[in-house]
Amino acid sequence: MIIKPKIRGFICTTTHPVGCEANVKEQIAYTKAQGPIKNAPKRVLVVGASSGYGLSSRIAAAFGGGAATIGVFFEKEGSEKKPGTAGFYNAAAFEKLAREEGLYAKSLNGDAFSNEAKQKTIDLIKEDLGQVDMVVYSLASPVRKLPETGELIRSALKPIGQTYTSTAVDTNKDIIIEASVEPATEQEIQDTVTVMGGEDWELWINALAEAGVLAEGCKTVAYSYIGTELTWPIYWDGALGKAKMDLDRAASALNDKLSATGGSANVAVLKSVVTQASSAIPVMPLYIAMVFKKMREEGVHEGCMEQIYRMFSQRLYKEDGSAAEVDEKNRLRLDDWELRDDIQEHCRNLWPQITTENLKELTDYVEYKEEFLKLFGFGIDGVDYEADVNPDVATDFIAI
């Protein structure tokens, strides 16, 4: 079939398998061009491995460090009549390209929050790799099914205490609007921590440790975003921030556990990027369009792949083997360039000046839209979008 982008809300409901593969190839090419990561781990598990920072982590490990990788994710396959999710095609492309280079790559597809996911992953590690040296936790989900009760818990992207009103961009109509978000209830705050906090990361690491599949010196990292006062009301000071603070709590507990065998657990605070997750957060698209333009002008712009390569090569697995620099909460800070005073001051001053008329001129809004479509495999150089493609891509993913 010939597949064109169809946007509904902040989601593109169609995906292009060839475009998704081209995206993965682009990230692999970047990683190879940077050269090998000297002290990289050789057996890596990525939970949430099919898009965004998780996918880039798997690429950095495999193509930057020559690692055998296992990926866990929850994606839908395509059929002859309907495309699957972008993450499905990303993961399929990754496996194919890794194996072509003689790298071990296997994936498990299903609910990563479930006990079955953890058990099947443990069985696979025991069977094929023995142990793992690194566990990346990069799940972004609006819903978590509690393994013990089967109850579905939903997260809320809301402020705390009072209604948050701000200038935002309507990405469907490309106009500047005033967005208001009602505050979260106590229950919604708790639920957001349950879905997006550190509990499941702890459950994963504890299950892997008890099964004896964590190698000595195993490092684990989970991803977070703090941002700046421009986005704090909806993010860090909102329900989502409470969940991210719970990640810090989990990191501390896990670090105590892993440091006994020479390992570590850290939260890595990353920069804002265009992902399906960030496009759903009110105000983020406008902030991203502003900050990207300034960072590009300053020569410090990074996408997911650049950030993660820097995290591997300049933080966790440095060439001289020295310990990673961390902040006062033991976090790896990769948002250091975005948070530079000159960049943030530029955004603060620009924010009130943005109108529908000057949006495209004063910000990288056009590029934001292009990057958003790229997530789903569209608008990529060298891909023939008039060609007939088969959305039914064969894989040997292990079903959870």
From Swiss-Prot:
InterPro entries, sorted: Eno_Rdtase_FAD-bd_dom, Enoyl-CoA_Rdtase_cat_dom, FabV-like_NADH_b, Trans-2-enoyl-CoA_reductase
Pathway: Lipid metabolism; fatty acid biosynthesis
UniProtKB keywords: Fatty acid biosynthesis, Fatty acid metabolism, Lipid biosynthesis, Lipid metabolism, NAD, Oxidoreductase
Residues marked Plays an important role in discriminating NADH against NADPH (site): E75
Catalytic residue list: Y235
EC number(s) recorded for this UniProt protein: 1.3.1.9
GO biological process terms held by the UniProt record: fatty acid biosynthetic process
Keyword Acyltransferase annotated: no
Catalytic activity, as annotated: a 2,3-saturated acyl-[ACP] + NAD(+) = a (2E)-enoyl-[ACP] + NADH + H(+)
Enzyme category, top tier: oxidoreductase
UniProt KW NAD keyword: yes
GO terms of molecular function: enoyl-[acyl-carrier-protein] reductase (NADH) activity; NAD binding; trans-2-enoyl-CoA reductase (NADH) activity
Residues the record lists as binding NAD(+): 48-53, 74-75, 111-112, 139-140, 244, 273-275
Chain sites annotated for binding substrate: Y225
Pfam families: Eno-Rase_FAD_bd, Eno-Rase_NADH_b, Enoyl_reductase
Family listed: Belongs to the TER reductase family.
Subunit description: Monomer.
Stated role: Involved in the final reduction of the elongation cycle of fatty acid synthesis (FAS II). Catalyzes the reduction of a carbon-carbon double bond in an enoyl moiety that is covalently linked to an acyl carrier protein (ACP).
Name listed for the protein in its UniProt record: Enoyl-[acyl-carrier-protein] reductase [NADH] 1
